[in-house]
Amino acid sequence: MLLLGFYRSGSWILDPNGAPILTDFTPMWLAGREALAGHAAAAYDSRHFGEIQTEFVGPHAGQYPWPYPPIFFLPAAVVALLPYAWAFLAWQAATLAGCLAAGYRILRDGLTPLAILAAPLSLLNAYVGQNGFLTAALIGAGLSFLERWPIIAGICFGCLFYKSQFLLLFPLLFAIAGHWRALAATVAVGALLAIASSLAFGVEPWVAFPPALTERAQAALVVQDLAWGKLQSVYGLARALGLGALPAGIVHAILALLVAALACLIWRRRGSFDVKAAAAASAALIVTPYLFAYDMAAIVIPGAFLVKDLIERGGTRREHAAIFGLFCGLFAMFAGAGIVPLGAIVNLLLFSLIARRAFRGPAPSPAV
């Protein structure tokens, strides 16, 4: 209803005159149009792509880059077949459906979709037209299929190559736990997607992508072409607190390595798979320095696995209170989006709760 109100007021997708509004979805749709026109590599030319955006949304709207690998031209080209507004709605509806399905598969509770919809970062992702729902769907589905259907899990994680910063930890965890079929499927699907994108759009995008990615990383992580409050990683928090690029990078690297090491230890131990899945999904959001508010929509996945374990094995009142507090923290993060990167703190607190449960085991609540 809130999004409908934004749309009717001319502040979402289209302005009051029916012209497109610049959102994070705009570069995806325009990149898809470039790919359909036969020159996908042009999307990595920041000057050319900026001119296209200016022509599409006007000179005063600003510009967004196209930082995704060439495999992401595949879905971009599909949505670009639709008119802009319909493409926006179709993309959000399809990826949200995947996210809701993944959440339901984890908890098997009819209230799960409602909880995901109630999460404030779901509204943020839908408003800006981003791909946080897709990231959540792939991680959630991949982990939920891992034990019984490892090939399907590998397919999900192979598709996550579109945002490889969230994939970094999973192959290592799969190797540690002996999920070799899932690991092989992940690599195979990634390779097949690369081949498919090359056949569809040529090899030129693969040549243009590395320098474009370097340029974007330099702009986002060093030059600061955006407010540090939008970067929800430990690195973003350190920069927001006044640290320079090098010391912030060191702080992030130390915490990322610590979290990765703990996740590996959790996956080496015998114990609840739900706790292991929660640890992996949570750690994936912490180890990358490149994490924006809309990416935090994926926090529902570690939360769902943790809640499932609390339901099945019991938990203390403190654990239940902590979960509720973290959920409230997401609202605080939503209110402070772009000002203070509270997402880093929420992620670290959630992982701490998961790790505590992994190493100490469940402690049932006292009987009432």
Predicted regions and their residues:
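Primarily membrane-embedded glycan-assembly and transfer machineries that use lipid-linked glycans
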Residues: 1-152, 174-300, 304-311, 365-368
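Short alpha-helical segments used as structural interaction elements across diverse proteins
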Residues: 127, 160, 249, 353-354
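Membrane-embedded alpha-helical segments of transport systems
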Residues: 162-165, 192-197, 319-322
